């Protein structure tokens, strides 16, 4: 009996996951995230140099970050731009150096382009959440400016704190000697989860539950880590881009990776947005749970009725009706005068 109950619960669980995946697939088709990812990748490439220039300017404004600027750059390019990170870092640093020599109007234009990227991200995520109410211009600009100014500061502060924790003598013992390398190895994964979680909870112009956002963030972070390893393996083992494009191979490699990254980000957003819809649908509907063969689970717990039992019950009902008819009072008739 207990095994049957456990089997039924497992069937219900897998069927629930399957129905959620079907709902998620329908959402992905409706929202066309491949087109949205292509748009965001194009805007990202246009805004990459301005965004990096603004980020480095914000880090330079704080003396505590001057000593670790190289570490921050190495961490970002190594963990978020696989295979071609070194080449991209050289070019972007050169572009940023040229951009920093511009006039005030040019620097203001860089800030505007960086804001355009954040605005495109905001619109894409709010479209996924089916948000009808738009933020006012003042609120939207304030949020975009906060992301540009506070985002680099938070990233730098987290890396500084991590470097400080690693350097503590508390972790120099034999018992904890293997903990820190494992922690440092998982650090990019933790940063990815935190970044996706913050993105899915703050950007949508509606309330998002923490656990829903955490689910989407964890899935997106796992796919991002797998994507990094898979893309780096493809670029190194199958150097078709370098054979075709030569010295310009970095450009298509960067574009493809940015496109895949946005596909992963939007997929995590779709999971986060689809979860409350699916739960509301399940709670409001009275759909009969079925097993993997399509049979109702309720019917499995109903005992089978033999044909002999049905015929015996039918004959007993006929005899009862005959007795009632025999005991009924006879109607009297009046003679005609």
Swiss-Prot record:
Keyword Cell division attached: no
Family, per entry: Belongs to the UPF0761 family.
Subcellular location: Cell inner membrane
Membrane spanning residue stretches: 4-24, 45-65, 102-122, 137-157, 183-203, 213-233, 247-267
GO cellular component, one term: plasma membrane
Highest taxon in the source lineage: Bacteria
Name of the protein described by the UniProt record: UPF0761 membrane protein Shewana3_0311
InterPro entries per UniProt: UPF0761_bac, Virul_fac_BrkB
Alphabetical keyword list: Cell inner membrane, Cell membrane, Membrane, Transmembrane, Transmembrane helix
Membrane topology designation: Multi-pass membrane protein
A UniProt-annotated Pfam family: Virul_fac_BrkB
Source organism: Shewanella sp. (strain ANA-3)
Main location: membrane
Region (Disordered): 292-337
Compositionally biased tracts (Polar residues): 328-337
HAMAP family: UPF0761
């Amino acid at each position: 009996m207990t095994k049957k109950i456990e089997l039924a619960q497992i069937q219900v669980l897998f069927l629930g996951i399957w129905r959620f995946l079907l709902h998620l697939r329908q959402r992905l088709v409706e929202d066309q995230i491949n087109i949205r990812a292509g748009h965001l990748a194009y805007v990202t490439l246009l805004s990459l140099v301005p965004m990096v220039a603004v980020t480095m300017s914000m880090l330079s404004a704080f003396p505590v970050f001057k000593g670790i600027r190289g570490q921050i750059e190495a961490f970002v390019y190594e963990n978020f731009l696989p295979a071609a990170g070194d080449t991209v870092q050289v070019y972007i640093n050169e572009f940023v150096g040229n951009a920093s020599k511009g006039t005030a109007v040019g620097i203001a234009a860089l800030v505007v382009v960086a804001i355009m990227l954040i605005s495109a991200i905001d619109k894409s995520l709010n479209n996924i959440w089916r948000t009808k109410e738009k933020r006012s211009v003042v609120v939207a600009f304030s949020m975009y400016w906060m992301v540009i100014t506070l985002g680099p500061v938070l990233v730098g502060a987290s890396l500084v704190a991590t470097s400080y924790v690693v350097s503590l003598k508390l972790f120099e013992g034999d018992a904890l000697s293997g903990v820190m390398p494992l922690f440092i190895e998982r650090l990019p994964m933790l940063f990815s989860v935190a970044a996706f979680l913050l993105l899915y909870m703050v950007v949508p112009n509606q309330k998002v539950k923490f656990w829903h956002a955490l689910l989407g963030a964890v899935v997106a972070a796992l796919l991002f880590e797998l994507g990094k390893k898979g893309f780096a393996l493809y670029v190194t083992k199958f150097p078709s881009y370098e054979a075709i494009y030569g010295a310009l191979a970095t450009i298509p490699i960067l574009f493809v990776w940015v496109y895949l990254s946005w596909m992963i980000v939007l997929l995590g957003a779709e999971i986060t947005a689809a979860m409350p819809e699916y739960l509301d649908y399940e709670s409001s509907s009275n759909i009969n749970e079925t097993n993997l063969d399509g049979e109702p689970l309720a019917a499995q717990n109903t005992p089978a009725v033999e044909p002999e039992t049905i015929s015996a019950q039918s004959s007993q009902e006929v005899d009862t009706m005959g007795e009632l008819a025999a005991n009924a009072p006879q109607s009297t008739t009046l003679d005609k005068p």
